[in-house]
Design a protein with these regions (language model features):
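Short, hydrophobic/aromatic-enriched beta-strand segments in well-ordered soluble domains
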Residues: 13, 114-116
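A conserved amphipathic terminal alpha-helix motif
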Residues: 117-145
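Hydrophobic ligand-binding cavity/cleft-lining segments
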Residues: 1-42
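Tryptophan-centric aromatic hotspots in well-structured domains and transmembrane helices
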Residues: 23-26, 87, 129-132, 136
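Hydrophobic-ligand binding "helix-grip"
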Residues: 33, 46-52, 57-107, 117
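Generic alpha-helical structural signal
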Residues: 16, 71, 133-137
Length: 145
């Protein structure tokens, strides 16, 4: 039962790439299409207006062939260390969720930490948790080859 309180999650992964390369992979539409999504989900399109107040949108092909669109607005950008943006599945209903992505480079590799907040219920939180882990797998495969 949802008592009106929102849930959050944090997932972290160290990837063998510098922070600038990771930030670019996360914000360049051509690169997003190449890696975004937990397999077998694939990204069919990506639009990114990388500025505070700018919008992003991804089209995500699900295993059943349907396209799920996720969009939001950038709230903070500190290249190549931080992105904060809202997150809503279209059509957008209710208060958007919020995603914070931190890139902490050390010794030629980068710890990427995602905090996903304002999640409506535990089942959705668990799906997001699995989705972000899958996105990390796809991102690591894309960058580490």
């Amino acid at each position: 039962m949802n008592t009106g309180e929102s849930l959050s999650l944090t997932v972290t992964r160290t990837i063998r790439a510098d922070a600038a390369r990771l930030f670019q992979a996360w914000t360049d539409p051509a690169q997003l299409v190449a890696w975004w999504g937990p397999r077998p989900v694939t990204c069919t399109e990506a639009q990114v207006d990388l500025r505070v107040g700018g919008r992003y949108r991804t089209g995500n092909r699900l295993p059943d062939g349907n396209i799920l669109y996720i969009s939001g607005v950038f709230e903070a950008i500190e290249a190549p260390r931080l992105l904060i943006y809202t997150w809503q599945v279209e059509p957008a209903v209710g208060r958007p969720e919020r995603v914070t992505v931190r890139f902490d480079e050390r010794d030629g590799q980068t710890e990427v930490s995602i905090t996903h907040e304002r999640i409506g219920d535990a089942a959705l939180r668990d799906r997001h948790q699995a989705g972000w882990q899958g996105c990390f797998d796809s991102l690591a495969a894309y960058l580490e080859g």
